[in-house]
Amino acid sequence: MVRVSPSSPSARPGVTPDGAAPDTGALPTVSPVPADDPRGLALGFTAYFVWGLLPLYMAMLAPAGALEIVVVRIGFALIFCLVLLGLMRRLGELGTALATPGRWGTTGLAAGIIAVNWLLYAVSVTTGNVLQASLGYFMNPLVNVLLGVLFLGERLRRGQWVAVGIAVAAVVVMSAAMGQVPWIALGLATSFGLYGFVKKRFPSPVHAVTAMTAETVVLIPVFVVGSVLLAQAGLLTTVTEGPGHFWLMAGLGVLTAVPLILFSAAARSLTLTTLGMLQYTAPILQFLVAVTVLGEQMPAARWAGFGLIWLSLAVFTVDQLNASRLQRRAVRAGQGAHA
């Protein structure tokens, strides 16, 4: 989620933890719904549940490497989205989006950033570093805060400074424990934050699926060149490991688009506070999958690092809730004064 302060452009939830942002336009600073719709809550939780279990699915794609996973994901996501747009009768909208010269720069930038994010995510799975992916997405709200400071000139509240300071301490502890900087976690958090920043700073007027399709169209050269290089090196396992493996790889297209659709539907019927809470579902599930299923180790120093991140997020969340409550109170007071 992209949040700095309740009223800032970068403070509005709307980015998914698998690197796809629903283009719903500018969201209001105060939720338009008085309460959360149970159906929307179910849809939102399902979307984050799928994203949280994605590392488990990717682990089943062995012996495919990280580069092949990304290349094939681009290809099958494009196919699935084109079929979906056809069923939705929005193919014309895609043509309009691609024919708008002013959108090419933003679409290309977003596509490039999300390709890097997908690659780092795949690397985290294929190298046994899913815990770093979890750490990266836990850190994402804090990275969004820093992006607001760097690019929007926003000022942090005291609670936000405390949260960022604790997060920095967590990175230091994790670096000492690992003997190196957790570059996968930092790369995921940064690329994901930048992607969300671009999507919210330059919102697209088209449907979320249309926007995602346009981005995958831009990535077609990556798909073509990557497929050729992998085939020449004998590493294109999608077509050499049998039909079962092929369809598992094809499933990446479905898992890219379907959760996005669920999230987009949920975002229209949930408060921003609820969306902000739901975003932690994915990294929590990634953490549990890494430790209990994939067998990644959690020595004491790593527990300390994650503990500091969780403490930082607790401080951050309390600060956000307090700020949101004060804003709603101010809005009600203003409405009462003009009644």
Describe each PLM feature range.
Residues 123, 140-160, 284-303:
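C-terminal transmembrane-helix exit sites in multi-pass transporters
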Residues 2-46, 79-107, 158, 206, ...:
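Membrane-interface interhelical linkers
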Residues 45, 49-53, 57, 108-127, ...:
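Hydrophobic alpha-helical transmembrane segments of multi-pass membrane transport proteins
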Residues 2-6, 74, 176, 181, ...:
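C-terminal-most transmembrane helix of multi-pass membrane proteins
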Residues 81, 159-175, 186-192, 301-320:
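Hydrophobic transmembrane alpha-helices of multi-pass small-molecule transport proteins
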Residues 135-139, 203-218, 257-292:
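Helix-helix packing/entry segments at the starts of transmembrane helices
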Residues 52-78, 132, 194-219:
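Juxtamembrane helix-loop-helix junctions in multi-pass membrane proteins
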Residues 56-66, 93-95, 126-129, 171-172, ...:
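Membrane-interface helix termini and inter-helical loops of multi-pass transporters
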